[in-house]
Amino acid sequence: MEQYLPQAKEFISFIDKSPSPYHAVQYFSEILKSKGFIHLSEKQMWDIQPNKKYFFTRNQSCISAFAVGGKYKPGNGFNIAAAHTDSPNFKVRPVSKVESVGYQQVGVETYGGGLWYTWFDRDLTVAGRVIVKSGDGSYESKLVHIKKPILRIPSLAIHLDRSVNTDGFKYNTQNHLVPMIASKLSEPVESKSTTTTTTTESPKTSDPQDVNSSTTKHHAVLLELLSKELGCSVGDIQNFDLSVCDTQPAAIGGALDEFIFSPRCDNLGMSYCAMIGLLNVKESTLAQEENVLNVILFDNEEVGSSSPQGACAPLINDTISRVNSSMFASTCKPHELNNFIDLTLRNSFLISADMAHAIHPNYTANHEPLHRPALNKGPVIKYNANLRYASNGPTSFVILDICKKNGIPIQEFLVKNDSPCGSTIGPIISGTYGIRTVDIGNPQLSMHSIRETCGVADITHGINLIQKYFEQFTKLDIIKSDLE
């Protein structure tokens, strides 16, 4: 296991630096620029050249990085690995100022399908992006991560709920998931730190627009923490997208250092494997490549993907269109260019990379007897006859063949007939674009908990699989065959 530890430590460093999708995208943006990738803007014309590498972001929470093969021609395919940057959490509400029996609380909204009971009695904080007014009157989006524990959702003592261990822990997501941030003892601090009000009630003002100010909608103590972290005044804070997150760092654990205990394994785990896999592709390989190698990390998978930065948006088609237009518009007629875009879609292949369920030692009956992935035994191909996953015989064979040729362990998974099945961006993309797709992911335990578990060795296995996919897919014999 020791040989896998360096890569696992890099991964947990990434996790700790990525408390929100915005931070994850910023992390990858900095790495890509340091590795020679050119930062594109979707608001400007692109100048795409063969054997060059590029990336762009959308909404600060979605990123697409691609390397153009040195032998790329009109109609050639995109070899894509797609994952997502978001995880279930609590979002701070637009009006978050809540008070109850002497406590100041922060109103939050559930995002995705989390195991919300795991958020009780944790040391919590906030992270995300804040719209800040600059001295020249312009506005800027700044990332923020308050690293100390400022929030807590306390559980109810067993003395006040004697049946909790027999009847189960029951909670209401509206009433019982409201983090406390301070007590009313902080009221003198509020009146001192803001000029808008001297009480916790809404300020009296003759300006009707003041009811929409940040100091009216959020507790002053929260705004003060944000302003201190951002280096601005409270009045400069215009709006924000903040998520609640755990302050406990990710860690390598187990007696033999086999496990990673971490938040957001789903799906920063496969986001990391996909992007590092692309970065590890050799320059000599890219020079001889006939396709475009592309990693896309979408946002909003946990809530259906229906956003400009989600997998339902036409980002893949937009990218293919702009790359082909930039490279070949001067030498092709318009109708030929449209045909080449269609050909590119038909010649493309996509790995939908999302974490998978490992066999649980305490709940073995919940798993299909012949499909029980284990931690540290390699990535998992995910199947579902009802198309909750996009894998089929030919597309899964691509992965099996790559793994066999490169000594990468691989596993297979499907749910029991009497069990519901989750889904991924795989069926969305394959159904929208007709791109051949396979669903894979590293195995993990406690999916959608605030604290999840995955395998140390699987980080390396996942990276190796994505790298070899990018380096070898175009030349696989099956792609030249008539399996359509």
Swiss-Prot record:
Keywords tagged on the record: Acetylation, Aminopeptidase, Cytoplasm, Hydrolase, Metal-binding, Metalloprotease, Protease, Zinc
Subunit structure of this chain's protein: Tetrahedron-shaped homododecamer built from six homodimers.
Residues at which Zn(2+) 1 binds: H84, D266, D354
Subcellular compartments: Cytoplasm
InterPro entries xref list: Peptidase_M18, Peptidase_M18_dom2
Annotated gene: dnpep
Function: Likely to play an important role in intracellular protein and peptide metabolism.
Binding-site residues for Zn(2+) 2, renumbered to this chain: D266, E302, H448
MF (Gene Ontology): aminopeptidase activity; metallopeptidase activity; zinc ion binding
Compositional bias ranges of the Low complexity kind: 188-206
Protein name per the record: Aspartyl aminopeptidase
A Gene Ontology biological process term: proteolysis
Binding site for substrate: H159, E301, D354, H357, K382, Y389
Coiled coil: none
Residues found modified as N-acetylmethionine: M1
Primary localisation category: cytoplasm
Statement: the UniProt record of this protein carries the keyword DNA-binding: no
Keyword Zinc: yes
Highest taxon above the source species: Eukaryota
EC nos: 3.4.11.21
Cofactor note: Binds 2 Zn(2+) ions per subunit.
Region (Disordered), start-end ranges: 188-213
Swiss-Prot/TrEMBL cofactor(s): Zn(2+)
A GO CC term attached to the entry: cytoplasm
